[in-house]
A protein has these predicted regions:
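Cross-family detector of peptidyl-prolyl cis-trans isomerase
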Residues: 12-203
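C-terminal motif of bacterial Sec signal peptides marking the signal peptidase cleavage site
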Residues: 7-11
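Sec-dependent signal peptide recognition
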Residues: 1-2
Length: 203
């Protein structure tokens, strides 16, 4: 399987504490928000219609996880129902916000056959998921079938389907994911990632 991008390790000095690393992470997130003119809205405001206004570059901040989310397309089809198991196909780009660099992607034309497949279950409103090791760039690079918790946050608010007409579009989100909700290298390196992800229902 061909891979796109390279994993970037964020180094730190031996004397740097976890608190210091978290401050640097927060600074990187705040810098990205400021540089890109992002309007952060509260959960209360978001829950009025479960939408983010892309013309205003709105992102909702989920306080409990620290994840920022912008819904670019709500998607076609239906939301994953409680008690349902679903196959979800994802295309994504991953940027390391600490180094401001593209780290990984399966979302370019040259690699159209590459798609990350997740097995997702919703139980009492909580989502759990694992990557299919036979079809996952994330697994190939990071060596784990665990899906970053940040990837699951949008699933409660988007529709999951397959386009049945030219007017149907699959769901797409942009999320800022702190290390606590990220892939294992981000957890170890204490760095945030920016993801653009599409979600499509698998067969």
């Amino acid at each position: 399987m061909a891979l796109v991008g390279a994993v970037v390790f964020t180094s730190c000095s031996d004397s740097e504490t976890y608190a210091d690393q978290k401050k640097k992470e927060r600074s990187a997130i705040n810098s990205y928000i400021a540089k890109n003119g992002i309007k952060v809205i509260s959960e209360d405001e978001f829950f009025k219609d479960s939408l983010t206004d892309t013309t205003k570059n709105e992102f909702v901040l989920f306080e409990s996880s620290g994840v920022y989310m912008q819904i670019i397309r709500k998607g076609c089809g239906e939301k994953i129902k409680d008690g349902e198991n679903a196959t979800v196909l994802c295309r994504f780009t991953e940027r390391n916000l600490m180094t401001d660099s593209l780290q990984l992607s399966n979302d370019i034309i040259s690699y159209a056959s590459l798609v990350d497949k997740m097995n997702v279950k919703r139980n009492s409103g909580t989502f759990t998921a694992s990557f299919d090791a036979s079809s996952s760039v994330m697994y190939s690079v990071y060596g784990s079938t665990s899906v970053p918790s940040g990837w699951l946050v949008p699933l409660a608010y988007i529709k999951l389907g397959r386009p049945a007409s030219e007017n149907d579009q699959i769901a797409k989100v942009r999320i800022i994911v702190p290390h606590t909700q990220g892939q294992q290298y981000a957890v170890q390196g204490v760095y945030p990632c920016l993801y653009d992800i599409t979600y499509e229902r698998g067969r």
